[in-house]
Amino acid sequence: MEPYDDGFIEEQEEQEEERTEEKVINEEYKTWKKNAPFLYDMILSTALEWPTLTTQWLPDKQEVPDKPYSTHRLLLGTHTSSDAQNYLQIAHVQLPNPSAPNPDDYDEERGEIGGYGGSSKKAPMEIKFNIVQKIDHKGEVNKARYQPQNPNVIATMCTDGRVMIWDRSKHPSLPTGTVNPQMELLGHTKEGFGLSWSPHTAGHLVTGSEDKTVRLWDLTTYTKGNKALKPSRTYTHHSSIVNDVQYHPLHSSLIGTVSDDITLQILDIREAETTRAAASAEGQHRDAINAIAFNPAAETVLATGSADKSIGLWDLRNLKTKLHTLECHTDSVTSLSWHPFEESVLASASYDRKIMFWDLSRSGEEQTPDDAQDGPPELLFMHGGHTNRISDFSWNLNDPWVLCSAAEDNLLQVWKVADAIVGKDLEDVPTEELEA
């Protein structure tokens, strides 16, 4: 009798695990789909030709005269197979205008107008999505972000470490077959995903990469006739891959950086030191820190997302210990973004295929055992519409509670949580008053 082949058995076990996981994902998706009409006022799912690793709403919207919708713009990339051309893309999305409450939708039982998913008496309006501009890009687009002072100017992170600057108004709607950025920022030796424009100074940019460095760029030093630009400063304060960087939204000299070295570090660009940060937090997460987000309304509050599945909340004035920890994700937390209008609301995405909304004003609230089974008191909402890892998400600046989320399986979703879920009970508690 032949002995068992250990490799064969391992392979069989792995396949069985994959089948089980697939079954669980499908069951979860079926449940989500069944409940979706009660959870959302609007949801669009569209399959892109290629997956995108990046998505961001552009800050404008265009009203369409005599129509019940407006046109919003989305910034996307592509992640194609090795042979196919990649693109930086702009899409138009038609979103229904928020409607005034209709007395015909009055629900006597609940004493409310409308309900979960808005009015049940009106047919949902079809949401139209189409790509309106494709610009040839070298390799996949790891991340794309528009410049706040001029949204036509876009920075992209490339797979070879280059950062490219594009002025979309100088490119035709259809690709030309030639990669022709306005500038190339040369310095990183490996690819990266950390990218943040200064909201304070036009043309200032910070990037972080797998080469363990953080680099500052000043686009105003660009000279015509030479597309290549070198960094104005290079920081070597991290000992491993730099995953995310962000300019502080209220303090022009502060930049936050996070890394696989399990540290959160704060740079003060007024200081000449480039090998050490002005402030740092160590030992507070148990694994790599993937994401950082400064609260745009509470100047001392920031959040970090980690491969240890948790979200850390911090007070800039004391990084020795976290203010609070949020736990509910079942896999690595990969991106974070504060709500643009609700100071206490934070959104997080994870490899567990979920986007979660957290309302920090609920921190410390008592829960019944049944409530506790659904998650911690801060958990406001969980988006379960993706069956694959989420690569990026973005809040819409013109329509509160509208998000766009993109997953690794080509699926792009534009969605708005039902007002009945998030439209009330958001107490105006200053985020600084959070207790650990």
UniProtKB/Swiss-Prot annotation:
Compartments where found: Cytoplasm; Nucleus
As given in the record, the signal peptide range reads: none
Q: Name one GO cellular component term.
A: nucleus
Enumerate the residue ranges of region (Disordered).
1-22
Q: Which InterPro entries does the record cross-reference, listed alphabetically?
A: G-protein_beta_WD-40_rep (IPR020472), Histone-bd_RBBP4-like_N (IPR022052), WD40/YVTN_repeat-like_dom_sf (IPR015943), WD40_repeat_CS (IPR019775), WD40_repeat_dom_sf (IPR036322), WD40_rpt (IPR001680), WD_repeat_RBAP46/RBAP48/MSI1 (IPR050459)
Q: Which residues form a coiled coil?
A: none
Q: Which GO terms describe its biological process?
A: chromatin organization
**Major localization listed first in the record, in broad terms:** cytoplasm
The UniProt entry annotates WD repeats at 136-176, 187-227, 237-277, 284-324, 328-368, 385-425
Description of how the protein assembles with itself and partners: Component of the HAT-B complex composed of at least hat1 and hat2. The HAT-B complex binds to histone H4 tail.
Q: What is this protein called?
A: Histone acetyltransferase type B subunit 2
- Please report the organism this UniProt entry assigns to the protein: Aspergillus oryzae (strain ATCC 42149 / RIB 40)
- The primary gene name is hat2
